[in-house]
């Protein structure tokens, strides 16, 4: 039987197995024991099956949170793929639709038959394709977040874009809250932004890509994205969870929108933060976004004010880069709270195939965005050379100023 395997964390006051069996039946054929033998035989291939139950010890922390004593278990349930079409809405409604309303169930993972998941696109470009576009293959990429643009005009945008590029960043992304407006129209951001970055390229020989925020009403997005591709957009930033995973997939699969897509995690916090219910970050921000076609995925770093736990962040990165999957690897982009002094930690945790993404850590540098970018580049070079940041800072004024402002986290070899 071809089946999607769902792994859950279940809580129940009395009988975990009974609850698990109820889920398996309730999300497939509805009932079993009351059916005549002939109907059972006809429906057997559609029946969900509890495959494994691993009981966990009782947790006082869990009991205190829910205000009652609960049993806990990791449960695996197989859902026959014959029951649903190969699309993400059908998958999500089957495995966690009404179940998400339970409040005491957490969806930890989904495992797919190979022939089923091959019906999904995965990233069009992925890590290798993005590296080819930037021309950088031997280090983490550096990205700057375009902050403070609301209420500004195109002249300000192009000026600030040049500064960030002159600092040596590989990519600049719009802020996710920058929408189409009279002051900063979408198409003009693309054309004026490209012209500004071309000037910097001619001056320095360094290529910088600009991720423009694709926004608007859902049914207008495809035409807008096609126009962006026609205008030569480098990358499309997309607030995927405001629209839906299926919309991301539709953008990825359209051959007239052959532009890398950067998935932003805005609104994912409504689904992932609790350890007791909702959806695990490695699935929601990792496996499913890669399946749907994101080339880059932003997610909270373990270091900032909106931090994920380190193992959760690493789990997202593993899901995005797992070589066993039949898709291109997607770029992990740990974000929030990043400054040059954290670069040793970022590279230790996420390796070279990651993107160092900073907003305030670049724009808040004493020498502005140019100094901020140079400080990050110096920090990356130092780590790759095996040098402590403080030693490298003695020879690099921009890095020294960054360390003076934000400090440094050295990592032992």
Curated annotation (Swiss-Prot):
Any idea which positions bind substrate? Answer: 147, 173-176, 264, 337, 359-360
Q: What is written in the cofactor note of this entry?
A: Binds 1 Mg(2+) ion per subunit.
What result is annotated for mutating residue 173 to A?
Same activity as the wild-type
**Reactions accelerated catalytically:** 5-methylsulfanyl-2,3-dioxopentyl phosphate = 2-hydroxy-5-methylsulfanyl-3-oxopent-1-enyl phosphate
Keywords annotated in UniProt: Amino-acid biosynthesis, Isomerase, Magnesium, Metal-binding, Methionine biosynthesis
Q: What is its EC number?
A: 5.3.2.5
Q: Give the GO biological process terms.
A: carbon fixation; L-methionine salvage from methylthioadenosine
The active site is formed by: 98 (proton acceptor)
Name it: 2,3-diketo-5-methylthiopentyl-1-phosphate enolase
The upper taxonomy is: Bacteria, Bacillati, Bacillota, Bacilli, Bacillales
Q: Which gene encodes it?
A: mtnW
